[in-house]
């Protein structure tokens, strides 16, 4: 044990983030070999990390970047706001998004496989479950990304629209949470479910069938506009809808993606 110096233990701690006694144990077991000790800690750390994988991860950060006409966005989750602010957590998120773009990875399972070891190492260092929760991308000639406070992320692809207006629309999406691009994208099942709810509510008003029909129609028009981007009132000028704004430029939104920390947790 005499060859296991404090300096060696310190080096192993710096490289792994593991505790003093864990590092000392690993070095003793591996006869002072630093690389074998790292592997030793990974193996034991994996066991500890496995115990944490069922912990709910409802904190974290959204990362987004655009490169070569591809916009990518990832939601990296942890358990507490404290870890979300950690530089190691932030660095992992940045590395994930940069790697996805540079290697043109478009599948979340591939992303998870590439970063499984680094994610596990960070679980050991932070003592929290960490999860690559969502990943998505957009392709196009005119894309913009917008991140609000690290907790909301938006990617938007458009045609015939300047970057300033496109950014304003991205900010609108972040704030207004549209679920669909246009009313035409709303599924029949979603529409039917809401219609049945509004019909039952309207019946309680004891109006004639003709008036009930108009009441329900008005509520359904509001419903489809509220959840579709082009039907929403533009937050920077509520005298017009996003659709009307696009018409002014003879432009269109091709697609958009919106992530928000905590709105879809798959633990």
From Swiss-Prot:
Keywords: Cytoplasm, Elongation factor, Protein biosynthesis
Residue ranges of the region described as Involved in Mg(2+) ion dislocation from EF-Tu: 80-83
This protein's GO CC annotations: cytoplasm
Pfam families per record: EF_TS
PROSITE patterns linked: EF_TS_1, EF_TS_2
Annotated localization: Cytoplasm
Molecular function via GO: translation elongation factor activity
Family the entry assigns: Belongs to the EF-Ts family.
Protein purpose: Associates with the EF-Tu.GDP complex and induces the exchange of GDP to GTP. It remains bound to the aminoacyl-tRNA.EF-Tu.GTP complex up to the GTP hydrolysis stage on the ribosome.
Protein name: Elongation factor Ts
Gene name of this polypeptide: tsf
